[in-house]
Amino acid sequence: MHINNWPTHERPREKLLAHGAATLSDAELLAIFLGSGLRGHDAVQTARNLLHTHGPLRELLDRPPGDLMRLPGLGLARACKLTAALELSTRHLAAALQRGASIHDPISAGRYFAQRLRANPNEVFAVLFLDNRHRAISFEELFHGTINGAEVHPREVVRRALTLNAAAVIVGHNHPSGNREPSPADRMITQRLKNALDLIDVRLVDHFVIGDGAPVSFAEHGWL
């Protein structure tokens, strides 16, 4: 059945307008981008097939344009548009920080960490330093590790916070495996970091774990 024959409330575009993009599935978002599907399939089914065969979403979107253009349902034009859309998203988030916008929205902060860290093949631990109005001072990748982990030194985060005269920090790291579940080591270093920052009156606002799907927020889960 063509999407135009679906009930209005089930169509991806109408759902986006009524409830926001965040409520759509990966396949529905990709279907909106595709616009139309392969012969005999609607855009949603084509998107589902792409994700099933070449996904999950992170792996699909991390592909270079040369790889994307060879996938069924994409081609040269869509591959270039998709790559450009991802870069625009990254620049939009970066521009907001560079303008000194206050960061009070955890979704935007998590999205920024995801854009910066998700494509790394090894684990990277980064820190976003904020002033007393929660405006960005600096985003720094402080610790680089292997595919299995990165060694984090709270004293180095404290040193940089003092140097930058930061009032608060948001930290985040990626899991190259794609598994977003925080490990026991993640929870332990978060507590050590919070304790160290408390000593210099710098607030740890959040810790994001980046994997497949939406970032996991320690603050949102009450783990801080």
Curated annotation (Swiss-Prot):
It holds the Pfam family RadC. PROSITE patterns: MPN (PS50249), UPF0758 (PS01302). The keyword Zinc applies. Keywords: Hydrolase, Metal-binding, Metalloprotease, Protease, Zinc. Coiled coil: none annotated. GO terms for biological process: proteolysis. One of its GO terms (molecular function) is metal ion binding. InterPro entries: MPN, RadC_JAB, RuvA_2-like, UPF0758, UPF0758_CS, UPF0758_N. The keyword Protease applies. Zn(2+) binds at H173, H175, D186. Residues 102-224 form the MPN domain. A motif (JAMM motif) lies at residues 173-186. Belongs to the UPF0758 family. This is UPF0758 protein XF_0148. It comes from Xylella fastidiosa (strain 9a5c).
